[in-house]
Regions:
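Gly/Ser/Thr-rich helix-start
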Residues: 220-224, 250-252, 256-259, 277, ...
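Active-site pocket-shaping loop/turn-to-helix segments
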Residues: 77-82, 270, 274, 329-332
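Glycine/charged-rich beta-loop-alpha catalytic/anionic-binding loops adjacent to active sites
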Residues: 66-73, 169-173, 243-247, 253, ...
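Short acidic, glycine/serine/threonine-rich loops at helix termini
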Residues: 112-116, 186, 212-216, 257-265, ...
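Alpha-helical metal-binding/catalytic segments enriched in His/Glu/Asp
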Residues: 191, 245-247, 261-304
Length: 332
């Protein structure tokens, strides 16, 4: 599913295409009057008498080719609520086919800065789908034409939301990959490719980790035929020596539990044991894309906890990077 956003300079008073307008929580239709025909206005007001106005949005079928959607937003609405409204709209208009809608920004009543940006951001986040391995892919396309005097969005805000979307989608892609594809070797390779975004990437493989004395991390992955890695991801956007924000994420690409084996039921979900690391990676990519004026570092450990003749045993003792010894009573 793709969503395309177009900002239109021409502002038609009334449009023949599918239309999205904003109203208050009481579904006061005053703001609607200047943007639809008299017939459409009367039709909607008649239907509103029997509608559930507690809903966040209402869809009115004007004809087989036109819908008018009223989106209800409180004046004191929060940014996250606005994004949820955008997500709800996407669910309403996504029918798996090509669709074209106009959003009239002149009807926005909220005082929230960049209401439109948050609304469209929520819509785009909801549009995510991971169908990389589907034999038969369902393809559809939604076009949103932004019209009205309030349709202007600064270059920074567009970049900000674009960066957030790219970072979030990258995280979701990593989490959605199956364990036989995104093992530690492949994961490390993908992280190395983030250098093109201006991030500094350092990859510590088995040999370097052993030299550093990171035996606790190595112990988790020693039963796998794949390597174990520690990856640091740096973004220096503050142009000074200020201390960086630090983010650490767990990247167990698949966790069987080792010899302390997990139950078979739902073990397939253990491919998600690397989600923490994926969040850190997506965050760092987002910071780089928006040219954030901060210093930040992300650290992720990438391992695969498997059962084999070389796997760590319950009762093994390892020495950690800090120099402390650890008795492993449970390999999970």
């Amino acid at each position: 599913m793709t969503v395309q956003i177009n900002y239109k300079s021409n502002i038609p008073k009334k449009t023949a295409t599918n239309l999205i307008v904003f109203v208050d929580e009481k579904y006061n239709t005053k703001s609607l009057k200047n943007h639809v025909s008299n017939q459409e206005y009367s039709y909607i007001n008649d239907l509103l008498k029997t509608c559930d106005v507690k809903k966040n949005l209402l869809v009115f079928e004007i004809s087989s080719k036109k819908k008018i959607i009223l989106v209800s937003a409180k004046k004191d609405v929060q940014e996250s609520d606005i994004e949820n409204l955008g997500a709800e709209l996407y669910t309403s208009i996504n029918n798996g086919k090509k669709a074209n809608f106009s959003v009239n920004t002149d009807t926005i009543i909220s005082k929230i800065d960049n209401f439109l940006g948050h609304f469209l951001h929520g819509l785009k986040l909801k549009s995510y789908i991971f169908n990389k391995y589907k034999t038969k892919k369902v393809t559809s396309h939604i076009t949103i034409n932004v019209i009205g005097k309030k349709n202007k969005s600064t270059t920074y805000n567009k970049l900000k939301f674009k960066a957030l979307e790219e970072g979030t989608f990258y995280t979701r892609d990593l989490v959605s990959e199956p364990g036989n594809v995104l093992h530690p070797d492949e994961y490390a390779k993908r992280l190395n490719s983030l250098k093109k975004n201006g991030l500094k990437i350092n990859i510590y493989d088995d040999k370097k980790l052993k030299k550093l004395g990171m035996n606790a991390l190595l112990g988790v992955g020693q039963g796998s035929i794949r390597g174990s890695y520690l990856v640091t991801i740096e973004w220096n956007g503050a142009n000074n020596n200020s201390k960086p924000l630090a983010f650490v994420g767990k990247g167990v690409c698949f966790d069987t539990g080792g010899y302390s084996l997990k139950p078979a039921k739902f073990m397939e979900d253990m491919t998600y044991d690397m989600a923490g690391s994926a969040v850190v990676v997506g965050l760092m990519k987002s910071l780089a894309m928006r040219k954030a004026k901060i210093n930040a570092v992300g650290v992720v450990g990438l391992v695969e906890n498997m059962v084999s003749g070389n796997a760590q045993r319950p009762g093994d003792i390892v020495k950690s990077f800090s120099g402390k010894t650890i008795e492993v009573l449970n390999t999970d």
